[in-house]
């Protein structure tokens, strides 16, 4: 006689408690299995517990042919050989709500903050997107978006409210000024208007995108009409909705074209790379007054224009492009390796790499 199987049904609260310890990438795979799992992944209770208890993963994404891809960059040392690879492991699918056939959106630029992607499209639209939960919010402008606009996504550290910064450089005024607006997710509207004078963010490579660290965004900027070495670190504080000028390491003068920014794992620390001397500096302490303590982390014996930090300081691995807009990468560990990204098209290029930390954070709710 066959024994009857005893089916154990877990309460939804217990399921949420269990899943709050599972990585966001693993939970994202559950969305396609059933409507119930899809709804649970988007549940506010799970999002809050997951933020507190789940392991955080630092991954890499890249923009290729207007699509966002996950990239696996591996550099492992064995006894007799080094195992290294850079492969595209998956594509994030962002459907266009204006398309009857739900075609995918053509993405121009991507900005990452705490698991959310702020994407500007080639037809000048703006969307905030969580690839893990599939949640999106299309942001309507007060006035039409422009190709020249600069965008950043962050959050208020006091209220945990998401916000978007939009900057528009007004070149028809003398002196040149940068007008900016701030979108508040709680009110679902553009609430702040301001003008920032005396600064300039050149349109050079990927430097114009800025980087998010603990909710705030940082750029390398120049003093308006100043010499090329009159450079400073510009911060937009989403708690005060204002700009701050911060200090850079001052031991070696260099021009704007010789410096780039990156972040360590999970957007915890800001990094500055100086191609003149090939030095990597890490911001170890940031004061509200604008002062920053910098520590020199690494020095390389070759010239690099822009670098992405992919590993922590205990086992440093750095990646940079062999040539701009190419699919050839340098991987730097104990030695230098040049590899080609394994991708679907030999003609496709990797314009830049971004550190991406998946999460279940909800766009409509607080972080």
From Swiss-Prot:
**InterPro entries attached here?**
F-box-assoc_dom_typ1, F-box-assoc_interact_dom, F-box-like_dom_sf, F-box_dom, SCF_F-box_component
**Which domain of life does this protein belong to?**
Eukaryota
Pfam families in the cross-refs: F-box (PF00646), FBA_1 (PF07734)
Native organism taxonomy: Eukaryota, Viridiplantae, Streptophyta, Embryophyta, Tracheophyta
Which species is listed as the source? Arabidopsis thaliana (Mouse-ear cress)
- SUPFAM superfamilies, A to Z: F-box domain
**SMART domains this protein is in?**
FBOX
NCBIfam families (alphabetical): F_box_assoc_1
Tell me what this protein is called: Putative F-box protein At3g21130
PROSITE patterns membership: FBOX
Q: Where is the F-box domain?
A: 4-50
